[in-house]
Each structure stands twice: as structure tokens, then as C-alpha cells.
Amino acid sequence: MKKILFLSLLILPFTGCKTNNSEWKNLILNNSLEGWHIFQDDGTKSGWTVENDVFIFDAKMSSENMLVSDASLLSNKKYLSFEIKFDWKIEKGGNSGFMWGVSEDDKYKFPYQTGPEIQILETKTYSNPKSILGGEIESNNIIEDLGKKKKFLGAVYGIYAPQNPYEGNPPGQWNSFHITIDHQNNKGKVILNGILINDFKLKGNEWDSLVNKSKFSQSQDYEYLGKERWYGFAKSPKGFICLQDHPGKAYFKNIRIKEL
């Protein structure tokens, strides 16, 4: 009996740790940016505020030239496999994104050089590309993608178009994402407002083939990225999660994560 009790006491702490790790955890704490930081911040970057437990990015408040450096918001913690839920909204013509597997090595200038992105944008820009914020570069991105939708809302940017394209709620209204990144089972998915819109692989022949057909294989181009270009793209399953800076304003709330 004493041996059984002793073994039970040994097992309890380990089972408890596993349970705690698999629980949903709130990532917005104390109405602050606690637990987050701006990408490669040296103390001079700006653009993010918190109001009533809502993260707000306003490009007009950011000190960054988005073609030179980046003010995206990164978690302090690195994640491997997880589910994440959050609500978001953007203004008319707006654009943002959620990334995972991001490296903050100073040889990279932008989070998207390493982290794949789930696209957030106003879908009406696909019928009027010039309405997207960010000027000619952003409107050309839409024009090039009109028949593919690999940059549409819920796409794995430039790689996987959503199998079930859905426009979501219009600018100024909240939308809800439930994103799964499961490396153990090689499975990712995006649920928007309760509707499954994208289901994709995270590695293997299919993933490699799609990346090879995308801009992420064109490392001879994109000089503004620096010498590393796209060589580190999607190479590290474990990394920071990221909310992207972009022209306009973007809002995020109710951010919760569960590690798998």
C-alpha cells in the first residue's frame, strides 16, 4: 500500500504538468504588451498600443519604413505545435497576418523571411486592387494573385489558397480565427468565424513543391531582404508567433493558445 501511494505521488506532478501545458492560455495580460515584443526592437520601434485588452497596430504611429525594417509583434515564447484563437478586425483596404516559426536572428530583416503567414486582408480588394492600403506594391500583389487566391484571406500566403474561400465580416467588424499548427501530424488548418476555410500540410513533397513554385524560392531576387533572402523560410518548426505590421490599423483581442 505504501509503495502504491509513493508511486502515485511521483506520477501526479508529471500528469499535472502535461495537463497544464495543454490548457488554453490567455496571451493578453494586464491590459499590456506583457509577454510580447516588437521584432528586433532596440527601444526605438513603435506602432503598438493596448486599449481594453485589445492590441492595436497603427502604421501612422510606427517609426518604421516597412521596406527597410519591421515593427511586427512577436511572442516572447517560442512555440512548436499549437492551436491559437483570436479575434481581429482591420480598416477598409487593410492587411495584416499571423505568422509562426519566426526567427529573430539579426541576419534577417523581416519576420516573413522565416515565418509562414496566414493572410488577413479586406477581400473586397480583390475586386478593386487599388483600394488596398500600401500603394502600388500591395495592389500589384493582388493583381498577380487574382486567379490563384494564394494571398486571399485565410491563405498560407503565397503557398496554399483557401479551399473554401470566405470573405468574413467587413472592415470595422470583428472576425474570429482558430488556427492549428500541428507538426507531429503534419497538419495545419484555418477556421474563420466557425467555418473551415483552409487545410494544409506543413512539410513533405506537397509543401516543398508549392514553396518551389512561389516567391520563397526566388532568392536571387528581393535585394531589399539582404543577403539571406528567403533561405531561412519555414526551416524552423519551432519559433515565435507573430502579428504583422502593415499599412493601416489592425486590432487583435481574445488571443488564446493551447500547445499540442
What are these model-derived regions, one by one?
Residues 1-23:
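Bacterial Sec-dependent N-terminal signal peptides
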Residues 17-260:
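Carbohydrate-interacting regions of secretory-pathway proteins
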